[in-house]
Amino acid sequence: MIISRPLCSFVFAGLSFAVILPAQALVEPGNQAARAEIRRTGFGVPHIVAANERGLGYGIGYAYAQDNLCLLANEVVTVNGQRSRYFGPDKATLEQRNNMASDLLFQWLNTPQALADFWNAQPREIRQLMQGYVAGYNRSLAEQTTQGLPQPCAAEWVRPISTDDLLRLTRRLLVEGGVGQFAEALAGATPPAQQKPLQVDAQQAQALQLAAARNQRFALERGSNAVAIGRELSANGRGMLLANPHFPWGGGMRFYQMHLTIPGKLDVMGAALPGLPLINIGFNQHLAWSHTVDTSKHFTLHRLQLDPKDSTRYLLDGQSVAMGKQQVSVDVKQADGSLKSVPRIVYSSIFGPVVQWPGKLDWDSKFAFSLRDANLQNDRVLQQWYAMDKADSLKAFQDSVRKIQGIPWVNTLAVDAQGQALYMNLSVVPNVDAARLARCSDPRIGTELIVLDGSRSECNWEVSAEAAQAGIYPSSRQPQLLRTDFVQHSNDSAWMVNPAAPLQGFSPLISQDGQPLGQRARFALDRLESLKTAGKISVENLQAMVMDNEVYQAGQVLPDLLTFCASELGDDAARLAPLCAALKDWDGRADLNSGIGFVYFQKIMTSMQAVASRWRVAFDPQDPVHTPSGLAIENPSVATALRAAMLAAVDDVAKAGLPAGSKWGDIQVSSISGKQIPIHGGPAGLGVYNAMQTVAGKDGKREVVSGTSYLQVVTFDEQGPKAQGLLAFSESSNPQSAHSSDQTEAFSKKQWQALPFTEQQIKADPAYEVQVISEEPDR
């Protein structure tokens, strides 16, 4: 057993802990000294036990810093708007956002008043968790500083944190589905009189491209699958849950696996995002749950009609209103190492900040566009997840989500030991119904971006007395479904969660009916139907949905590709021969041993997405699981496009230097731990449930940056939960840690691990180790 003594004070890197005034100032009177017991089991997963929230937070912050100090320190720099100060304005964040634009966003977002308001809205339990987290993190930081910080963050930008930093991190997560996607557009919004046409066009065009690409990547990088099986279909007659969130493998959205216990009050295990002292996805003694990124709208744009006399004033109900002006300043590192303060004015209307995208959301002499983000007023998010963590029944779990309404931009799926399966699309959504949308928007714009008339008050969000926040939908008017067979979700609307009970008739901002399903949802519904026909559904069946790596779209189009290959190809026959042979030999999966035919297939189908007439059978809302399907190779234009796509695929593979005998495991890898590990899975758009997003690496390889992250399959018996799982990218982001690649290797080998939950299971783990930490009481 490792027993750590209380640490009284630390001085390092020229900084004393006495300087963390914000954190110290926020400590509530009467706090007892924090004490936590951190028990580590296999793969370094911490099981943290404490008598109260402060002690629990203390253990969480300490354990997290042991495993991910550099990661969190870097994110703290980001949310403080200080990247330009330390790294220069022209470099980019991990999310490929320009440092200067990022800093301006967070300087605008995380003002002292915004942080104070958020903190004041938190109940004592949440404050205690956060205060404990800060103390635990700072203790670990001091210890590691004495020993020598990890090389990636042995730098001046690493410092003790405060509760304000945790608030900043939380608010950053809240706006991921809204204004967070508009950093460049917010930073570049400039009144027409101050615009320099050529310069602004170039800068803003780039901003638009980056933001649009990030908007598209949002669902890809933060997608997910979840399946909740009820007692009618489960092999043991109890609830059974598959959680398969697809999240980034690095940065501020990288999950951390842990188990949190306050005896008699809390006992929950699962995964959490950086800086959060609670579980986001997991299970407790009574239930298990997961989240999937929803398709609901969490912000609206408002077209402002400008005052002809002044483009920084707008007309509202016929009255001229001055835009708000908030000056933010970013400290920018100069070439000689000195700092220069760069001021910028962020303009806003009553709806929110003005954003500017040339050619799409222009700020000219007539109009400007303002963005209203529903989650900017969501100060309930931490209370929400803590209530879910503590829920002792599915009803209590559901009631908490209905009442608190703190879920920012995800659906929730859950099961309980009694065999109920629950789906809730209860996130924070602007209260704009179909009638108001019809009155207040241009139908030609569509619903990809909701643009409302900003010149009329009646077009603002409706306020309902039932809602937890002014201007959002009350939970009673959002999709919910309780079943005893199944519910599932893979980032489509709520419509086809279970085809036996379609969820229809909601505001377009919440959920849209009659839209084509994504390939992963079609795969899941098809697989569940097959399993249902064959008998009861087992844990192994749910694991196989992820790990057998079926490429669902191959079943729809591969026969047509092979038929085309067997047709008269003329002068292209010789060039296409390797491709056609590889497609014929391919097993239709994204496994490590799957052949190079999968690479050709990806490239072909990516090219064919631009061909609107490619499907032989068009989408039919009466049969959304099986349509659209088949490549219309008998259509001359489709055949021409297909031939071109195949030839381009041949050229791409040759250019990448991939040998004919290459296997998918030779190509798709993860090397974030410092060594290359083959990774199975593939693109979500092809119907690979085990979705992976990659970027180009060296020698034709693809480096995984996002995808399957925390995996869990949970069911129940008389004693409680029985869970198996994995954290695909491993527990630690420090390449020097023993736990930076161990779970990644297990994931590569498809080796699910039993998750120790009970005291007996934890203490019986071969890797069991205990560390007790405590702090001195307040004096």
From Swiss-Prot:
- Record's compositionally biased regions (Polar residues): 731-746
- The catalytic residues are 224 (nucleophile)
Q: Where is the signal peptide?
A: 1-25
Instruction: Extract one GO BP annotation from the record.
Output: quorum sensing
Asked whether the keyword Hydrolase is assigned, the reply is: yes
* Assigned GO CC terms: periplasmic space
Question: What further note is attached to this protein's record?
Answer: AHL-mediated signaling mediates quorum sensing in many species of Proteobacteria, regulating hundreds of genes, including many that code for extracellular virulence factors.
Quaternary structure and partners: Heterodimer of an alpha subunit and a beta subunit processed from the same precursor.
The text of the family note is: Belongs to the peptidase S45 family.
State what protein this is by name: Acyl-homoserine lactone acylase PvdQ
Species of origin: Pseudomonas syringae pv. syringae (strain B728a)
